[in-house]
Structure formats: structure tokens, C-alpha cells
Amino acid sequence: MPLYEHVFLARQDASTQQVEELTTQITGVIEGLGGKVVKMEAWGVRSLTYRMNKNRKAHFVLLNIDGPSAVVAEVERQERINEDVIRYLTVRVDEHEEGPSAMMRKADRDRDRDERGGGGFRGDREGGFRGDREGGGFRGDRGPRRPRDDAPAATEE
């Protein structure tokens, strides 16, 4: 049977429980038509690149599906009807990716960075070379403006 990756975005004001129920409903449709959900990943609430239907964030869910094309057609029809689904995309793939998806690996990498204490206070900025400023302090006033040589002066009539 053909393999598909299916991602749908649910409205941000839908609770996590509602998104799980929606995912369960979609999984039921897939299995009812002879398909199989190989993997399901909930990526959580993420910011959208641009506003969609007045939403700036959405719940992202990935489903790896093994089933006939009729399954995909019915899932997309159900999502078109459902008001909680903002967008969906189904792509046919040659084989499913083993292990966590790229989005989950990125989330793990970000979590590891937070645990290491990345960001935060990086020390004093005093000292170091600051060009013409002694000790890296305040530059002081600029001084008076010098006259312009390249433009003719405006004449009053």
C-alpha cells in the first residue's frame, strides 16, 4: 500500500484534549477504511509564519499513514468539514522516516540547549578594545557641526 505523511494544524484555542480527540477521530477513519497509522507525533503549539484564518499559532500533528488513496481522500474531507482544522497537507513518500521526525529532533536539541544554560548572562562587557574610546566608556558629545563644502549655500531672495 502507498505510504503518506499527513500534517494538520488545529486552532490554538482548541485544548490539547480536543486535539487528541481529533487525532483519535482521524485515526479511526484511517483504520476503518483499511489503512494504518504507523506513527503519530504531536508537535505542540507553534507559531505560524503568517496569519491563517485569524490565527497566529496552531497545534501541529504529524501522522504517518499506510493505506490506499481512498483513506487520504476521506481524511482530507473530514478535515475540510471540521472547524478546528486550519490547514492540512498530505504527501506521498517512498518510505517513512525511522525514529523522531526533524521537528522532534529540533525540539530535543532546543530542550538540550535550555538545560545546558544557553543564553542568559554572558559576563561583563567592560574592558576590551573599543576603538578610540579609552576604557570602553561613554563617547561624549559630538561637538559642533562642521560646514559643508560640497553643496552651494542656499541664497535668500
UniProtKB/Swiss-Prot annotation:
Keyword entries, A-Z: Ribonucleoprotein, Ribosomal protein, RNA-binding, rRNA-binding
Database matches in InterPro entries: Ribosomal_bS6, Ribosomal_bS6_sf, Ribosomal_S6_plastid/chlpt, Transl_elong_EF1B/ribsomal_bS6
GO MF term (any one): small ribosomal subunit rRNA binding
Cleavable signal peptide: none
Chain segments carrying region Disordered: 96-157
An example Gene Ontology CC term for this record: cytosolic small ribosomal subunit
Amino acid composition bias (Basic and acidic residues), ranges on this chain: 96-151
Coiled-coil residue spans: none
Highest taxon, organism lineage: Bacteria
GO BP annotations, alphabetical order: translation
Family: Belongs to the bacterial ribosomal protein bS6 family.
Protein role: Binds together with bS18 to 16S ribosomal RNA.
Protein name: Small ribosomal subunit protein bS6
Lineage summary: Bacteria, Pseudomonadati, Pseudomonadota, Alphaproteobacteria, Hyphomicrobiales
